[in-house]
Regions:
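Short loop/turn segments at strand-loop or loop-helix junctions that form parts
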Residues: 18-23, 54-55
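Short, flexible helical or helix-coil boundary motifs
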Residues: 9, 46, 79, 173-176
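A nucleotide-sugar donor-handling region in carbohydrate enzymes
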Residues: 1-16, 27
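A short acidic, often aromatic-flanked loop/helix-cap motif at beta-alpha or helix-coil junctions
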Residues: 1, 92-97, 154-162
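A short, glycine/small-residue-rich beta-strand->loop->alpha-helix junction that serves as a flexible
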Residues: 24-33
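Nucleotide-sugar donor-binding patch of glycosyltransferase catalytic domains
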Residues: 116-176
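Donor-binding and catalytic core of enzymes assembling or modifying cell-surface/extracellular glycoconjugates
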Residues: 34-136
Length: 176
């Protein structure tokens, strides 16, 4: 079933990373005020397109993003989407979501379960942004560690600054 599920590249995007955003971003220090700035900075410092995905996201940090938000149903109407360096693709259906994951260079999330496991199933580079105290539990579900990396958003209950998290992401992306 999965063998025929994900190989279409219906979007025709090339050389991109996917960052999936959900409620697990909410506990990152200064995310409501600073996330937009660091996403735009990252897009300038790497040689890849950034496609941000989210589904029905009503969180304040997400509402505060000024990055272009394109609903999946409208992406074909948005002719300049291929030229955008960073954009948000909202409410992507499951099949197309798998397609985005499969054709990416790197997938990043705060352990969005399905997203992480599909990325690892495809043996793709994956960054999981976790609280250090969650890592042991999460690792019970991670079998393919060859392409799996963790970046902490907190250690010993001390939140890590968003700037430090994005510096680590930038380093990993540029080392691909």
């Amino acid at each position: 079933y999965l063998d025929n599920f994900y190989k279409s590249n219906i979007f025709n995007f090339k050389n991109y990373i996917v960052i999936h955003m959900d409620e697990k971003f909410c506990d990152i220090n200064n995310v409501e005020k600073e996330l937009n700035k660091y996403l735009l900075n990252l897009s300038k410092k790497i040689e890849k397109k950034i496609i941000i995905t989210s589904y029905n996201n009503k969180n304040t940090y997400y509402k505060n993003l000024s990055i272009d938000k394109i609903h999946f149903n409208n992406y074909k109407k948005n002719e300049d989407i291929l030229n955008k360096k960073v954009f948000i693709l909202e409410d992507v259906p499951l099949k197309e979501f798998c397609d985005l994951i499969y054709n990416s260079s790197l997938n990043i999330s705060c352990h969005a379960g399905f997203f992480v496991h599909m990325s690892l199933y495809f043996k793709l580079n994956t960054i999981d942004i976790l609280n250090e105290n969650e890592e042991r539990w999460v690792n019970t579900w991670i079998s393919n560690k060859e392409t799996y990396n963790v970046i902490y958003k907190s250690k010993l209950n001390n939140k890590i600054e968003l700037e430090e998290i994005f510096k680590k992401i930038e380093t990993k992306v540029n080392n691909l």
